[in-house]
Amino acid sequence: MLDKIRESSKYLAPFVKGEHTIGIILGTGLGELGKSIEIEHAIPYMAIPNFPVSTVQGHRGELLIGSFGGKKVIAMQGRFHYYEGYSMKEVTFPVRVMHALGVKTLFVSNAAGGVNTNYLVGDLMIIRDHINLFPEHPLRGKNIDELGPRFPGMAEAYSKRLIQLAEEAGNKLNIPLQKGVYAGLQGPSFETPAEYNWIRVIGGDAVGMSTVPEVIVARHMNMECFGMSVITNSTASEELIKTNHAEVQD
C-alpha cells in the first residue's frame, strides 16, 4: 500500500502548491458545495494512479485543489462506498493520499437518514461519535507502522475542539444544529423499520453508508476529524417513509 500511496501523491504533488492541511469529503448530493471552493485544479479520479472511480449517481468523481474560506484545501467531490464492491482499503485510500500530501484535518459530510425522532428533513447534525456496523474493518490485516499504530484509540474520533467551534459558529449565524451519533452500515439497501428501531435502541441518531471507515483511517494517522450529516429523510413517524436514492440526493 505504501508504494501506491507514494505513487498517487507523487502524481498530485505538482498540483498542490503551498501548505494544504485541510481535507474535505463531499458526500451524496453535496457535490454542489464544491462550487464554493476557489478551484485551482480539478483532477478526475480516473486520472490519478491507484484511485478507484465512483459508480454512484450524485458523485462527480473529482479531486479539487484550491481555497475555501481563505484556507488551502484538498476536496473529494464524490467518495467511494463499500457497497460498490471496493475493499475497505480502496474506500479509504484517498484519505491516505491526502495525509501524504500534508492534510492534517479532515472534514467529512454525508446524507443520512434521521433515526432520532426529534430530527426533521433538512436538519444538520454534527457527528459527535459513530457506531461502526460495517462487516469489514478498514484496518484489518497487517499494520503499516509508518502510517499509524496497530490499535489506535477512538475515544475522540470527532474533535471536541472542532465541534465546539461549529456550535459557536452556528449560534453566531443563527443556524440550528443537531448533535448526535452516526451509525454506519454497509448498504446498498435502505434500512427496514425494524433496523431503524434497532439503531435507535443502540444509540444511533442518524444512519448512512459511509464516513465511518474514512474517519477510522484518518484517526489511525492522527488526523483531526469533523463530521456533518444532512438529514435527507426521517423515520420519526410510525409509518416508515419510503426512501429512494433520488430523495437522498435532493
What are these regions (language model features)?
Residues 83, 151, 155, 184-188, ...:
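Glycine- and other small-residue-rich loops at beta-strand/loop junctions that grip anionic moieties
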Residues 236-250:
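His/Asp/Glu-rich mid-to-C-terminal helical/loop segments that flank catalytic regions of hydrolases
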Residues 1-154:
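Metabolite-binding pocket within alpha/beta catalytic cores that recognizes anionic/polar moieties
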Residues 193-237:
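A C-terminal functional module that forms or caps the active site or interfaces directly
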Residues 163, 168-205:
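Active-site/ligand-binding-proximal alpha/beta "capping" segment
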Residues 134-136, 234-239:
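Short acidic/His/Gly/Ser-rich catalytic and metal-binding motifs that mark active-site loops
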